From Swiss-Prot:
Cu cation A1 binds at residues 161, 196, 200, 207. Its main location: mitochondrion. One of its GO terms (molecular function) is cytochrome-c oxidase activity. Its EC number is 7.1.1.9. Component of the cytochrome c oxidase, the last enzyme in the mitochondrial electron transport chain which drives oxidative phosphorylation. The respiratory chain contains 3 multisubunit complexes succinate dehydrogenase (complex II, CII), ubiquinol-cytochrome c oxidoreductase (cytochrome b-c1 complex, complex III, CIII) and cytochrome c oxidase (complex IV, CIV), that cooperate to transfer electrons derived from NADH and succinate to molecular oxygen, creating an electrochemical gradient over the inner membrane that drives transmembrane transport and the ATP synthase. Pfam families: COX2 (PF00116), COX2_TM (PF02790). This is Cytochrome c oxidase subunit 2. It is an enzyme of class 7 (translocase). One of its GO terms (cellular component) is mitochondrion. Its cofactor is Cu cation. Residues 1-14, 88-227 are mitochondrial intermembrane. The gene is MT-CO2. It is a multi-pass membrane protein.
Length: 227
């Protein structure tokens, strides 16, 4: 989860998030080198008199500053496209769970367990226990298994929402009248937090998501312990 004054990304809990962190570092390195090169060129131009007003063209230089950026863009685009297609893959999910956004709470439906349905509301500050996180705790957590592909079917009943858990690398829009899906495989047990990431009205900031990831064997006993 996130920590105060944190500068980096949250620890990955899924292969997709691990790939996103690697790509972030890859792209950040490329952008840092480009920024340093541009700043060096600007500084050199301002502090030296290495100018020549008689030069009308420099085809070699123009070729370099056309081909080099193109190569850099390709090196950034390929890993980006790989992750993009990886997030869209749906390969025989073991479980399907439906998430419905409302103003301003979530409804979860376990379609593989007799259609178990429950709502998940944010806990008001008066109901928090010592150690609980303000604006992030809910009354009913969504319980998910680890080490098994899970498909989340996400939609909305009223306005646009977005079901997001950063540590899993998940962010899927909940659109009224449309059913979006995302598949993920969690790798570590724990409790992970997210929030609605689409401005959805006055209480948009009070619409948290809490996922409790547990071993597959325990999950297969039935998700009734979420209530």
């Amino acid at each position: 989860m996130a920590h105060p004054a944190q500068l980096g990304l949250q620890d990955a809990t899924s292969p997709v998030m691990e790939e996103l962190i690697t790509f972030h570092d890859h792209a950040l390195m490329a952008m840092s080198l480009i920024s340093l090169l541009v700043l060096y060129a600007l500084f050199s131009t301002l502090t030296t008199k290495m100018t020549n007003t008689n030069i009308t063209d420099a085809q070699e230089m123009e070729t370099i500053w056309t081909i080099l950026p193109a190569i850099i863009l390709v090196l950034i685009a390929f890993p980006s496209l790989r992750i993009l297609y990886m997030t869209d893959e749906v390969n025989n999910p073991s479980f399907t769970i439906k998430s419905i956004g409302h103003q301003w709470y979530w409804t979860y439906e376990y379609t593989d367990y007799g259609g178990l349905i429950f709502n998940s509301y944010m806990l008001p500050p008066l109901f928090l226990n010592p150690g609980d996180l303000r604006l992030l705790e809910v009354d009913n957590r969504v319980v998910l298994p680890i080490e098994a592909p899970v498909r989340m079917m996400i939609t909305s009943q009223d306005v646009l929402h977005s079901w997001t858990i950063p540590t899993l690398g998940l962010k899927t829009d909940a659109v009224p009248g449309r059913l979006n899906q995302t598949v993920f495989t969690a790798t570590r047990p724990g409790v992970y937090y997210g929030q609605c990431s689409e401005i959805c009205g006055a209480n948009h900031s009070f619409m948290p998501i809490v996922a409790e990831l547990i071993p597959l064997k325990i999950f297969e006993m039935g998700p009734v312990f979420t209530l």
